Amino acid sequence: RIVMDRAVEVVSEKIQKKEKFLIPLANPRTLEQLVGFSLLLRDKKDKDSLVALNVINDDNDSLKQELQGKHSLERAAQIMTEADVEPKTVMRFDLNIATGIFHTAKEHDVTDIVIGLHHRKSIVDSFLGTLSENLLKKTCMQVMIARFHIPVTSLQCIIVAVPPKAEFECGFVKWISHLCRMSKHLDCQIHFYAHPQTSGYIRKYIRKKHRDINAVYTDLVSWEDLLILTGQMNYECLLVIVSARRGAISYDSSFEKLPGQISRYFNNNSVVLLFPEQNGEQQ
């Protein structure tokens, strides 16, 4: 336990390094929500921590895409400016959208990616979509895949489902800090559902670094009990599900059920699927 506590302290120190959030914008209808969400996650002291990106597929009607992308980036810049954040926007042409996002992330020293949950075009289409799946394979950084049904500023509570062994991931305290910032900005309660051991580390870190937030803890002994959260959710709550990439310490085969569970039981809720930062080299 002493070794684990020291590991959390080391990662806590690393989070003090410059953060940069990349926001790939593909759908004008979700633009304001994604930028608004990213604004809530950032450290307010950092005035240049957001990068809005539009990747244009060179293989299709690029002129139409370019006009739409330009409009989206202008709107994103406006939202950032209104929040007293230095607007940084990038338009990129690439045959592969995921590759375009990946290279932009490397060029701008990005630490986190915030992306919208794609709209399924057919029943054979995957829940996350090819783009998100490729990003998770190509990068080790934290990726947040978000879907909002109401404006982010209207959220009244944040419910976080945390899998067992999440404390062993190198991105553990990073996502806790991000969600605590969001809770503080919104002045709303954040409720963690986690295994007792994992919950202990969350409590300790929050007491040390974010003692001013309203945090509540409930034991979630088995990840199979995730569906009990359906009784805790309402339209004004955000559900954050902490997942993990294949091969990660906290990865569990039951994560494969998450797409179906979200679609069936949380379809009317605002949801963020969070993949913590991992150790390793970017591809």
Q: Positions of the model-derived regions?
A:
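Membrane-embedded transmembrane helical bundles of large multi-pass transporters/channels
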Residues: 246-247, 258
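Charged helix-capping and loop-helix junction motifs
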Residues: 128-131, 254-259
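Short, flexible loop segments at boundaries between secondary-structure elements
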Residues: 262-283
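C-terminal structured domain segments
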Residues: 249-251
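Structured cytosolic domains appended to multi-pass membrane proteins
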Residues: 13-232, 240-241, 247, 275
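N-terminal signal-anchor transmembrane helix
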Residues: 2-17
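Intrinsically disordered terminal tails
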Residues: 223, 258-264
